[in-house]
Amino acid sequence: TDQPSESIVMAPRKTSVSEIYTHIFEDLDFCMDSRLSVAQSDGGRVTMWAAKALKARLLLTRASELNDKALYEQAYTLAKEVIDNGPFELSKDFASVFDMENSDGNGNKEVIWYIDYSSTNQLYNQEMDNDIIRSGGNHTHLIFCMKYDDQPGMVRSIEYGRPFNHYMPTRYLLDCYDENIDQRFEVTFRSLWKANGGKTGDNYPYMVQGDTAIWITKDVVPQVKRQWAKGRYQILDRTDIYHEDGSVKSQKQCMPISKFEDPTRATVNEDRGTRDAFIIRVAEMYLIVA
């Protein structure tokens, strides 16, 4: 329902998907008709372009469910308008999109809408004294970081992040990338950790500080290569991380998503990241048009 409840409802009516989309599109049309600004000086605010881009996304979603040609055409038209008339442009390479130097959404020309997590934004980035919400900031740098700081040669560092390792890629996701032709793979995933002061233990007597400590690959490593690395550094390949059917063997060590890392944190245990969260990028509009 779109009306507030004023008493106990004993027989609630489930709103249909169609009705929900009707309300969503009405809200977005209201935004576009309300003369929203086309630019923003205050980080993360909704602009006219953000409303149009979000509607293009949702039109495409709805069109794919209904196979509705008219909705597809509306999605195309809105996305094309954002591309042709908006102040956005594609980055020259994928790496620059998530480079920490370009993490300010207001200065990244590919970003249409974002959440402002800058250190000066005390609304989203404040330290909170709350049992449920301990602190603000962008926490994506935590949840994708694998458990590396208990491995030979490694200690927790700002460079490699604070490992909460809540999420990991499936084997299927890794196999979707052809790293020989797709520049996104190397930028999106971390595969190398260099020894940074941790104890090497008895199993790695030849490990060198500043050189490879852990190398992870989505491929199968030949035995001859494993034998050469023995005592020097740790190798983890697809057979170490995934079962034959693709299910997970280890949730602690994996090839983690690295594009959300935040090397600007003040300490190794700081959880408040200042990387802005990019919600909609103009790259998505090109995909919708395609």
Language-model segments: what does each one mean?
Residues 1-47, 57-70, 74, 226-227, ...:
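Aromatic-anchored glycine-rich loop motif in surface-exposed flexible loops
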